[in-house]
A protein has these predicted regions:
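Transmembrane-helix signature of polytopic, membrane-embedded enzymes
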Residues: 83-108, 125-126, 144-146
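Short helix- or helix-capping micro-motifs
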Residues: 3, 99-109, 129, 133, ...
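Extracytoplasmic catalytic/substrate-binding loops of multi-pass membrane glycan-assembly enzymes
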Residues: 15-31, 43-55, 64-65
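Transmembrane helices and adjacent periplasmic/lumenal helix-loop junctions
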Residues: 148, 152-165
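Membrane-interface transmembrane helices that cradle and orient dolichyl/undecaprenyl
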Residues: 91-95, 129-147, 157
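Transmembrane alpha-helices of multi-pass, membrane-embedded glycan-processing enzymes
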Residues: 48, 52, 56-64, 70-84, ...
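Transmembrane signal-anchor helices characteristic of membrane glycosylation enzymes that use polyprenol
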Residues: 1-22, 107-109, 157
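Short acidic/glycine- and proline-prone juxtamembrane loop motifs at membrane-interface regions
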Residues: 48, 113-124
């Protein structure tokens, strides 16, 4: 039930705060436009992680305005953070009541963050939560598939924001 409320609040918050953005949003939207047009000379850079811009590209190909594409990417980032955080809570073995509390806190706080920013922070945090949830598994070292999945998730987090390195 909390995820339904979270998604509804995130969507409502996104629609009601379309014109609000931070300064980084302009850079990410511009880089997404470079990726969507195949201008790799400007798209590839050493400062901005590509993942958030990549999430915007399919929307740009469909003719969506860059600001809406950025907000939709943030909606996806909020979902990744929500589910990644719950995966981590489950992985460390907290009780069901603790998981429900975390789910409701996330459902009520994520919309406020994602509606005012176009930034990879939620995306990288969600991917890191997924990676940490995999890493705390008792069979992490014994299960090659889990170890590779953990490494791949950390790699995706790095593509979202270099701080994950």
């Amino acid at each position: 039930m909390a995820w339904v409320v979270a998604y509804a609040l995130m969507l409502n918050s996104m629609l009601n705060n379309m014109q609000q953005m931070n300064t980084d949003a302009i850079a990410y939207m511009r880089i997404a436009e470079y990726w969507s047009s195949g201008n790799l000379g400007f798209a590839v850079n050493g400062y901005w992680g590509p993942m958030l811009s990549w999430l915007m590209v399919p929307f740009l190909w469909l003719g969506v305005e860059p600001l809406l594409a950025g907000k939709l990417a943030m909606l996806f980032s909020g979902a990744i953070f929500f589910h990644g955080s719950l995966f981590l809570v489950r992985s460390v073995g907290l009780r069901l009541v603790d998981e429900l509390i975390v789910a409701w806190v996330l459902a009520l706080t994520i919309p406020g963050w994602m509606s005012n920013h176009v930034t990879p922070d939620l995306l990288v945090a969600g991917l890191m939560a997924f990676a940490l949830g995999q890493a705390v598994s008792p069979d992490w070292l014994a299960n090659r598939r889990r170890a590779l999945g953990t490494g791949a998730t950390w790699g995706l987090a790095y593509l979202a924001k270099a701080v994950a390195l």
